[in-house]
């Protein structure tokens, strides 16, 4: 089982926000995650990002692979 750190879409039509989750790579986009790691709300200005870095680091140490978008959000959060 390979694990991905990816975005799961939440919210209403045209008012989306995203949860950052650790999920089995074969699972569907909004399927049951292994763990919630944070959220990303692009609808507010500036975009709101909150990530639990300890949980993310735990998954990265276990070999989880972030998607490109999550990788970008992690870089913004770190610096």
Swiss-Prot record:
Record bears the keyword Ribonucleoprotein: yes
Source species, domain of life: Bacteria
Keyword annotations: Ribonucleoprotein, Ribosomal protein
Molecular function, one GO term: structural constituent of ribosome
A GO BP annotation: translation
Coiled coil: none
Alphabetical list of SUPFAM superfamilies matching this protein: Ribosomal protein S16 (SSF54565)
Annotated Gene Ontology cellular component terms: cytoplasm; small ribosomal subunit
Family: Belongs to the bacterial ribosomal protein bS16 family.
PANTHER family attached to this UniProt entry: 30S RIBOSOMAL PROTEIN S16, SMALL RIBOSOMAL SUBUNIT PROTEIN BS16M
Protein name (record): Small ribosomal subunit protein bS16
